[in-house]
Curated annotation (Swiss-Prot):
It comes from Cryptotis magna. This is Cytochrome b. The chain crosses the membrane at residues 33-53, 77-98, 113-133, 178-198, 226-246, 288-308, 320-340, 347-367. The cytochrome bc1 complex contains 11 subunits: 3 respiratory subunits (MT-CYB, CYC1 and UQCRFS1), 2 core proteins (UQCRC1 and UQCRC2) and 6 low-molecular weight proteins (UQCRH/QCR6, UQCRB/QCR7, UQCRQ/QCR8, UQCR10/QCR9, UQCR11/QCR10 and a cleavage product of UQCRFS1). This cytochrome bc1 complex then forms a dimer. It comes from the Eukaryota. Component of the ubiquinol-cytochrome c reductase complex (complex III or cytochrome b-c1 complex) that is part of the mitochondrial respiratory chain. The b-c1 complex mediates electron transfer from ubiquinol to cytochrome c. Contributes to the generation of a proton gradient across the mitochondrial membrane that is then used for ATP synthesis. Heme 1 (or BL or b562) is low-potential and absorbs at about 562 nm, and heme 2 (or BH or b566) is high-potential and absorbs at about 566 nm. SUPFAM superfamilies: a domain/subunit of cytochrome bc1 complex (Ubiquinol-cytochrome c reductase), Transmembrane di-heme cytochromes. It is a multi-pass membrane protein. One of its GO terms (biological process) is mitochondrial electron transport, ubiquinol to cytochrome c. One of its GO terms (cellular component) is respiratory chain complex III. The gene is MT-CYB.
Length: 379
C-alpha cells in the first residue's frame, strides 16, 4: 500500500516540499536562512497576535496600552520584547539570505529572486508601520519624516501624503490605518513566501559551486530537517539572550517618551535595519533625488540578474569578485553606522562616498570584474 503522505492531497504538498524534496548534497549553512526566516515570520505573527489582543490603536491610549502590556499582562514584557527583537532577528536573517543569493548567484532563478525582492519591500513596510504603533517620540517623528518623503513626487506629492495621513498631520487616522496594515501584511508576506517556495521548487535549490546538482541529490528529510533544527536552536539562543539580557539594546531611548508633536527629537532616525537606506537618502541634498536613491538602493536588487556578466554562476571560484562582494558588505556596514550619526562633518562626506561606492559596486565594478575574470581564463 502506498504511504498516505504520498497520496493524501494535503500531505502530498507537505511531503514534496519538506520531506521527499530532492536537495543538493553540498549546500552549506548559508542555505539555512530561508527556513530561519519562516520561523521568524511564525514568531512575529504569534507574538503580534497576542500583542494585538491588548493594544489599542488610538493616539490617546496607544502608549499607555504598550506600558500596560509590559507591566500588567502576564508575560506581556516577554511577548513585547520577543516581537521587537524578533524583527531585528528577521532582518539579520533577511540580509544574510540576500547576501547568500548575491554571492552564489541564486538570483539566476528570476521568478524566485523577484518575489524575494517583493518580499523584502513588504517586510520593510511592515516593520516601518510596526515601529509607529507604540506612539513614542521616534514613532511619531519617524512616521512624519518618512511619509513626508512622498511629497517629493511631482504634482500629486502633497495630496498623496495627506491621503496617507488621513488628515493634515500624522494623527489618530494615521495610527489606526497603520495598525490595520501592520496586522494584515504579515499574512500577505506568508502567501508571498509560499509563492517564493513554489517557484524555488520548480527549479530546485542552487548550491555553493553554482553547478547543476541534478546528478547528486539527497532527500530533504532527515538531512536538512536536522540541519535546519540546529539553525533554529541557534536563532532561539541569540533571540532569548537578546530579550532576557538586553531587550532595549537595539531600540531607541526616545521611544520611551510619549509622542509630542510640539517637541522634535534632536536626531530622528529609524530602526538599525533601515539605517543604510536612510544614510543613502540623506547623502543626496535634493529631496526627490534622495527619495529615488532610497528606493533604488533596494530596487537595484531586481536588476542584479540583468547585470550578471560572469560565465560562472557562483563567486566561489572568483577571488576578485569575492573581494568586491566583501567590500560591498563593509560599505553597507559603514552606511549603517553613518545613518545613526548626526548630519555634520565628517559624517556627511563619508555617507556620500559610501553611497556612491554602493551603486558603483553593484552597477559598474562587479559586472566589469566578472568580464575581466572571464578574459583571464580566455572564456
Amino acid at each position: 500500500m502506498t504511504n498516505i503522505r504520498k497520496t493524501h492531497p494535503l500531505m502530498k504538498i507537505i511531503n514534496n516540499s519538506f520531506i521527499d524534496l530532492p536537495a543538493p548534497s553540498n549546500i552549506s549553512s548559508w542555505w539555512n536562512f530561508g527556513s530561519l526566516l519562516g520561523v521568524c515570520l511564525i514568531i512575529q505573527i504569534l507574538t503580534g497576535l497576542f500583542l494585538a489582543m491588548h493594544y489599542t490603536s488610538d493616539t490617546m491610549t496607544a502608549f499607555s496600552s504598550v506600558t500596560h502590556i509590559c507591566r500588567d499582562v502576564n508575560y506581556g514584557w516577554l511577548i513585547r520584547y520577543l516581537h521587537a527583537n524578533g524583527a531585528s532577528m528577521f532582518f539579520i536573517c533577511l540580509f544574510m539570505h540576500v547576501g547568500r543569493g548575491l554571492y552564489y548567484g541564486s538570483y539566476m532563478f528570476m521568478e524566485t529572486w523577484n518575489i524575494g525582492v517583493l518580499l523584502l519591500f513588504a517586510v520593510m513596510a511592515t516593520a516601518f508601520m510596526g515601529y509607529v504603533l507604540p506612539w513614542g517620540q521616534m514613532s511619531f517623528w519617524g512616521a512624519t519624516v518618512i511619509t513626508n518623503l512622498l511629497s517629493a513626487i511631482p504634482y500629486i506629492g502633497s495630496d498623496l501624503v495627506q491621503w496617507i495621513w488621513g488628515g493634515f498631520s500624522v494623527d489618530k487616522a494615521t495610527l489606526t490605518r497603520f495598525f490595520a496594515f501592520h496586522f494584515i501584511l504579515p499574512f500577505v508576506i506568508t502567501a508571498l513566501a509560499g509563492v517564493h517556495l513554489l517557484f524555488l521548487h520548480e527549479t530546485g535549490s542552487n548550491n555553493p559551486s553554482g553547478l547543476s546538482s541534478d546528478a547528486d541529490k539527497i532527500p530533504f528529510h532527515p538531512y536538512y530537517t536536522i540541519k535546519d533544527i540546529l539553525g533554529v536552536l541557534l536563532l532561539f539562543l541569540v533571540l532569548t539572550c537578546l530579550v532576557l539580557f538586553s531587550p532595549d539594546l537595539l531600540g531607541d531611548p526616545d521611544n520611551y517618551t510619549p509622542a509630542n508633536p510640539l517637541n522634535t527629537p534632536p536626531h530622528i532616525k529609524p530602526e538599525w535595519y533601515f539605517l543604510f537606506a536612510y544614510a543613502i537618502l540623506r547623502s543626496i541634498p535634493n529631496k526627490l533625488g534622495g527619495v529615488l536613491a532610497l528606493v533604488l538602493s533596494i530596487l537595484i536588487l531586481a536588476f542584479i540578474p540583468l547585470l550578471h556578466t560572469s560565465k560562472q554562476r557562483s563567486m566561489m571560484f572568483w577571488p576578485l569578485s569575492q573581494c568586491l562582494f566583501w567590500i560591498l558588505v563593509a560599505d553597507l556596514l559603514t552606511l549603517t553606522w553613518i545613518g545613526g550619526q548626526p548630519v555634520e562633518h565628517p559624517f556627511i562626506i563619508i555617507g556620500q562616498l559610501a553611497s556612491i561606492l554602493y551603486f558603483l559596486l553593484l552597477l559598474v565594478m562587479m559586472p566589469i570584474t566578472s568580464l575581466l575574470e572571464n578574459n583571464l581564463l580566455k572564456w
